[in-house]
Amino acid sequence: MKPILLQGHERSITQIKYNREGDLLFTVAKDPIVNVWYSVNGERLGTYMGHTGAVWCVDADWDTKHVLTGSADNSCRLWDCETGKQLALLKTNSAVRTCGFDFGGNIIMFSTDKQMGYQCFVSFFDLRDPSQIDSNEPYMKIPCNDSKITSAVWGPLGECVIAGHESGELNQYSAKSGEVLVNVKEHSRQINDIQLSRDMTMFVTASKDNTAKLFDSTTLEHQKTFRTERPVNSAALSPNYDHVVLGGGQEAMDVTTTSTRIGKFEARFFHLAFEEEFGRVKGHFGPINSVAFHPDGKSYSSGGEDGYVRIHYFDPQYFEFEFEA
């Protein structure tokens, strides 16, 4: 399984994301550059230039018309995917940590950090109403008083937002009223990443408490746990197999000149139902910060602390693999 190596960032990768069809891969890092690549051959299609700080999050809408990015330069920006033109600039008081388009691509949400004396908020903008963008006034703003949001995604059909907090809590916020619909605390430490399944019925969380967990998206009921010995930075669900991939490793600040084996910098594959690990993929020099499955399930990508993104196309053996219970 020889990976395609994407070199387009000078700093560590913060998030990677495929569009719905999977022909494009968006990558953001702790530098101000937003890159888009052809996932089939790793060719760089272009960059979205404008941010002046680390970019924490990226998302593309349903028909890949618009791209949304959130950055530590205290802004969330909307781009035209094809031309790279900046369509909107939404200023915030603190860094934008998570962002996302809803199911229809009309409403965006983003969450800001609790820093510099400012509160953590989730803001909602309707892109069909230009006055909201021009005046920088969201139609709804949810304050998070307790612990800041570290990862968030839109729930099924854009009815709610599922947010993971620094404390390990999971909240489901109504996208209509802003109230907390469900609150659970299954993790003991910060939730680094949340990714939904293809049909949006369940999602996987990755946490600093060395586990990834599977939840039901409507009830937030805890289903499965995948345990490792290191903090998990990212986890993704396969669209056509009962597989989950975990990326993690030591925290960046703890990584010294240890060998790559000691730091446990592999991507790890677990069976969804049996919670058993069945494979590992080495490669990154440093922890893996973000993983994503291609929507057709035939490949996956990982972005690391080393600033590289690797696209791995699975060998034929992967598709013939039978898990023996």
From Swiss-Prot:
GO CC annotations, alphabetized: eukaryotic 43S preinitiation complex; eukaryotic 48S preinitiation complex; eukaryotic translation initiation factor 3 complex; eukaryotic translation initiation factor 3 complex, eIF3m; synapse
Repeat listed as a keyword: yes
WD repeat coordinates: 8-47, 50-91, 144-183, 186-225, 283-324
Covalent cross-link site, Glycyl lysine isopeptide (Lys-Gly) (interchain with G-Cter in ubiquitin): 282
Subcellular location: Cytoplasm
Keywords: Acetylation, Cytoplasm, Initiation factor, Isopeptide bond, Phosphoprotein, Protein biosynthesis, Repeat, Ubl conjugation, WD repeat
Source organism, top-level taxon: Eukaryota
BP GO annotations: formation of cytoplasmic translation initiation complex; translational initiation
GO MF annotations, alphabetized: translation initiation factor activity
Annotated positions of the N6-acetyllysine modification: 264
Residues with PTM Phosphothreonine: 219
Transmembrane region(s): none
Residues modified as Phosphotyrosine: 308
InterPro entries cross-referenced by the UniProt entry: eIF3i, WD40/YVTN_repeat-like_dom_sf, WD40_repeat_CS, WD40_repeat_dom_sf, WD40_rpt
PTM comment text: Phosphorylated by TGF-beta type II receptor.
PANTHER family from the UniProt entry: EUKARYOTIC TRANSLATION INITIATION FACTOR 3 SUBUNIT I (PTHR19877:SF1)
Family: Belongs to the eIF-3 subunit I family.
Oligomeric and partner information: Component of the eukaryotic translation initiation factor 3 (eIF-3) complex, which is composed of 13 subunits: EIF3A, EIF3B, EIF3C, EIF3D, EIF3E, EIF3F, EIF3G, EIF3H, EIF3I, EIF3J, EIF3K, EIF3L and EIF3M. The eIF-3 complex appears to include 3 stable modules: module A is composed of EIF3A, EIF3B, EIF3G and EIF3I; module B is composed of EIF3F, EIF3H, and EIF3M; and module C is composed of EIF3C, EIF3D, EIF3E, EIF3K and EIF3L. EIF3C of module C binds EIF3B of module A and EIF3H of module B, thereby linking the three modules. EIF3J is a labile subunit that binds to the eIF-3 complex via EIF3B.
Its biological purpose: Component of the eukaryotic translation initiation factor 3 (eIF-3) complex, which is required for several steps in the initiation of protein synthesis. The eIF-3 complex associates with the 40S ribosome and facilitates the recruitment of eIF-1, eIF-1A, eIF-2:GTP:methionyl-tRNAi and eIF-5 to form the 43S pre-initiation complex (43S PIC). The eIF-3 complex stimulates mRNA recruitment to the 43S PIC and scanning of the mRNA for AUG recognition.
Name of the protein described by the UniProt record: Eukaryotic translation initiation factor 3 subunit I
